Amino acid sequence: MSLFEARLHAGHFRSLEARSTLLDSYARVLARWPVPYESRYVETRYGRAHVLASGPAYAPPVLLLHGGGGNATTWIHNIERLAGSLQVYAVDIIGDAGRTEGRRPASEDAYCNWLEDVLIGIGRPKLGLCGSSFGAWLAAAYLRQTSRRVSRLALLAPPNLESMRVSFMARAGLALTFPSERMVRAFQAMVSSPLAPEPPPWAMDDLLVRWRCQRGHPRPPGRMSDADLRVLPKQTLLMLGEDEALYDPLRAFARVQALAPHVRVELLPGAGHAIAYDQAAKVDDALVEFFRRDGWTL
């Protein structure tokens, strides 16, 4: 990559050195990936998108979309179980802390165009789509535009089922502005359930690198409208944690049930916003059962 290209692709990092530091951390986490994987790139109109592919080729294909400020390696706590039963594609979302090229999109349409290109590039007629937090917002936004490439939709702790609490926004803003170890650890504790296990030291080290090396995170999406909820596909699984920090999970649960009774909604005890880590085994089992339920599209 030329210096010009490096500067172009480093736009959402604090510096070229920060980008290099983050990619080194990415490689260290990937070295712990517990299953065989293929690292590949697919072409999009915004630059190449990086994808980690794991799991048997004959299994139901599923694309994973990570949370804001993360990358494909943040699924490391789930990949062993998922890749045992599914063909998993974990993509680095554009404009975030991974290997995907291109600047952070400025609009919902641009994000959806990018995701459309990724789905085309993977080359499967249809895939299951699973998003966590910001990735759940992106998955739902894409399905509002088209469902022709998606067989099933799983949403883990969507950030916009209700308006975000002011206290959460304030804590997140402080941690982004002053990403000291104390601040980032406090924020991590807030988004996790008090019953969740402590992240291993290497995972916290990677989290600190990601917070310190980026120019902020993707902008929080606005609250899902009643119409947005009503048009969620019939084959949708939505999982929330009882200790959700962004909003009242009971209120969100009731809202989805009232407006989208066709959606399967689960409320997990012992899980916060970081639901895929806090209750990894339960989330993994639910995802495998959901995406394998009626067979798959080859």
Annotate each language-model stretch with its function.
Residues 1-60, 86, 125, 292-298:
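Alpha/beta-hydrolase fold catalytic core
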Residues 50-98:
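Conserved HGGG/HGGXW glycine-rich cap/lid loop of the alpha/beta-hydrolase fold
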Residues 68, 127, 131-136:
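Conserved alpha/beta-hydrolase "nucleophile elbow" surrounding the catalytic nucleophile
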Residues 90-130, 285:
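Active-site loop/oxyanion-hole signature of alpha/beta-hydrolase fold enzymes
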Residues 137-144, 151-179:
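Flexible "cap/lid" loop of the alpha/beta hydrolase fold
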Residues 237-271, 277:
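Conserved loop-alpha-helix segment in the C-terminal half of the alpha/beta-hydrolase fold
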Residues 263-298:
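Catalytic active-site module of serine/aspartate enzymes centered on a nucleophile-bearing elbow/loop
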